[in-house]
Amino acid sequence: MKTILTYAAAAGCLVALGSTAKGRSAYDGSWDLVFVTQRGACDPTYNFPVNITDGVVTHPNLVRFRGYVAGSGAVRASVTVQDKHATGSGRLSGASGRGTWSGYSGNARCSGYWTAQRN
């Protein structure tokens, strides 16, 4: 359960600020994400890749995940997996990024930060 919450928070952190993707984005490509839990009972760290195409962030295993990377690189997150939910925000710049995330799994609450590196 801890892994699913961290996974959900991690993936969601690249959902953008509500803009819509229109054509190729400067952030298109494969990115490696690292999520670190600073508070709560979630996994201490979690790593996984995502892909950005035309500003749309995707991961094949997430059911309720959608979003876009804003042209400015600003990002905001929201993802739900079963009874787990997470949100986050931050910024991509060039080939890296960072931000914060928080979420819950039932009554358990967790939060921390994320970093991203372009492949």
Where on the chain are the PLM-derived regions?
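Bacterial N-terminal signal peptides
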Residues: 8-16
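Central antiparallel beta-sheet cores of small beta-barrel/beta-sandwich binding domains
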Residues: 24-119
